[in-house]
């Protein structure tokens, strides 16, 4: 395990170095920093993944002292033969796309243009597989021009050189060879600075890894005969809930479907899917408003698609007065009603009640689901909340509820609970678990938080 630790430490050092570079060039905590960090890290990951895989299919490259040089000397036909032999979840890279090639061109004055064109060319070449899309079917490419975020034109080439300098110190190939499973932890570390409050409608409601794991374990249980499973999150954020579910089921046994209105979340979700060997699900990761324009539909395009497992950690309160009437015009979907627009404090509109209804509507007849809700929902005596409660209890859909510790979520001090649904409606009793006192307190900046320990 010492080797794993060494690679993991080097990976964390790489992330810290990339963040330091952004800081040096005036983009520390800038709104564009996350784009640079996530895309450059992903470029490094895919470059090394490509190198690892091409050496498995080409003896020439495997035995070469410098495989990048040997690859560059091959003919175009040889490259095409290699591409045909690669698994479908491996990106196709030309010699000029490799980190080694960029390293050798750093002395050129227009290196920022070379760097940017390399990134966009890789994205264009792999657009069919390595892209997500909007609800209007616009492809969202893998990479974009990154040096444009440096305001000073004269600093762009040095910035690009500084980024590439950080990418050549080690390779992920050893991690691939030994099947080390630490990229889920690396993703958590990579995005930890960007899961803060603010920034976007349905802002990035990050789910702590421990809670995601608990939800996945309780949903899937000890089921072993799982295959062709479809999992969905209508408020996916960065995908933590879906990744935990896929890991429990088996990444090779399930397909992920996701939607979130946030552009930032979609970029991070893309990275999360790739790091977790779920490239085939990228096409199902949609950026768009789930409530007014749900993307995932049945084959006839009229009804909502239904899934084996549905999970969600939606925003609880939010001003959606601009779209409220459009939502209310869909009474079949929102059968329990839609919260009214208050005269004051529109930001306190209970948008989570709409996501509960959407989750229930998205379950197969034998499907299971789980959703994070404010604990106050459980004792609601009126309004939309009461109608939903009455429905899930009377119809025997809800089978469990866990009250979580306060301050367990980074962005809210609201007490939260997790509801568990089983649409087969076989359960007569609801299991209530009080986990509010579990876990340990820790300091998160100026805030006192609580995190759960791993428990069954």
Regions found by a protein language model. Give the residues of each.
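Non-catalytic, mostly N-terminal accessory regions of nucleic-acid modification and defense proteins
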Residues: 1-214, 218-219, 281-290, 403-406, ...
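Helical mechanochemical/support elements of P-loop NTPase systems and associated helical scaffolds
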Residues: 10, 14, 29-33, 159, ...
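Glycine- and acidic
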Residues: 21-23, 172, 196-202, 251-256, ...
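A conserved structural/catalytic subdomain of Rossmann-like adenosyl-cofactor enzymes
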Residues: 2-5, 304-456
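Conserved S-adenosyl-L-methionine
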Residues: 201-312, 317-328, 373-376, 384-398
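Flexible interhelical turns and helix-capping residues at alpha-helix boundaries
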Residues: 26-29, 223, 249, 363
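A generic secondary-structure signal for well-formed alpha-helical elements
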Residues: 44-50, 54, 194, 223, ...
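Generic recognition of flexible, low-complexity loop/linker segments
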Residues: 23, 273, 292-300, 358-359, ...
């Amino acid at each position: 395990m010492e080797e794993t630790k060494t690679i993991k430490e080097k990976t964390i050092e790489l992330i810290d170095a990339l963040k330091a570079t952004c800081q040096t060039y005036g983009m520390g905590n800038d709104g564009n920093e996350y784009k640079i960090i996530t895309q450059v890290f992903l470029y490094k990951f895919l470059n090394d993944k490509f190198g690892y895989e091409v050496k498995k299919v080409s003896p020439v490259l495997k035995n070469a002292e410098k495989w990048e040089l040997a690859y560059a000397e091959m003919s175009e036909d040889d490259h095409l033969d290699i591409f045909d032999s690669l698994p479908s979840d491996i990106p196709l890279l030309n010699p000029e796309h490799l980190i080694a090639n960029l390293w050798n061109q750093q002395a050129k004055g227009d290196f920022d243009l070379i760097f940017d064109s390399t990134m966009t060319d890789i994205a264009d070449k792999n657009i069919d597989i390595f892209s997500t899309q909007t609800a209007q079917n616009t492809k969202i490419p893998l990479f974009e021009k990154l040096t444009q975020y440096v305001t000073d034109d004269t600093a762009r080439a040095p910035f690009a050189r500084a980024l590439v300098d950080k990418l050549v110190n080690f390779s992920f190939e050893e991690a691939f060879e030994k099947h080390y499973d630490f990229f889920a932890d690396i993703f958590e570390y990579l995005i930890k600075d960007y899961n803060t409050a603010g920034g976007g409608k349905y802002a990035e409601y990050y789910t702590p890894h421990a809670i995601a794991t608990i939800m996945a374990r309780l949903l899937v249980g000890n089921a072993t005969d799982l295959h062709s499973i479809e999992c969905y999150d209508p408020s996916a954020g960065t995908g933590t809930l879906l990744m935990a579910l896929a890991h429990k089921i088996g990444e090779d046994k399930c397909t992920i479907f996701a939607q979130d209105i946030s552009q930032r979340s979609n970029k991070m979700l893309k990275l999360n899917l790739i790091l977790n060997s779920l490239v085939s699900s990228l096409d199902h990761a949609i950026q768009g408003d789930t409530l007014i324009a749900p993307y995932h539909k049945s084959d006839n395009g009229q009804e909502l698609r239904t899934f084996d497992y549905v999970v969600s950690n939606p925003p609880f309160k939010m001003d959606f007065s601009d779209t409220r009437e459009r939502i209310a015009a869909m009474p079949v979907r929102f059968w329990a009603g839609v919260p009214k627009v208050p005269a004051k404090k529109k930001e306190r509109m209970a948008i989570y009640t709409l996501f509960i209804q959407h989750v229930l509507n998205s379950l197969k007849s034998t499907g299971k689901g789980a959703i994070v809700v404010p604990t106050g929902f459980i004792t609601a005596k009126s309004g939309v909340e009461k109608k939903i409660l009455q429905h899930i209890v009377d119809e025997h859909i809800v089978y469990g509820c866990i009250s979580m510790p306060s301050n367990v979520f980074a962005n809210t001090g609201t007490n939260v609970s997790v509801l568990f649904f089983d649409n087969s409606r076989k359960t007569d009793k609801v299991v209530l678990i009080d986990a509010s006192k579990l876990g340990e307190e820790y300091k998160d900046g100026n805030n006192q938080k609580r995190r759960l320990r791993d428990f069954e």
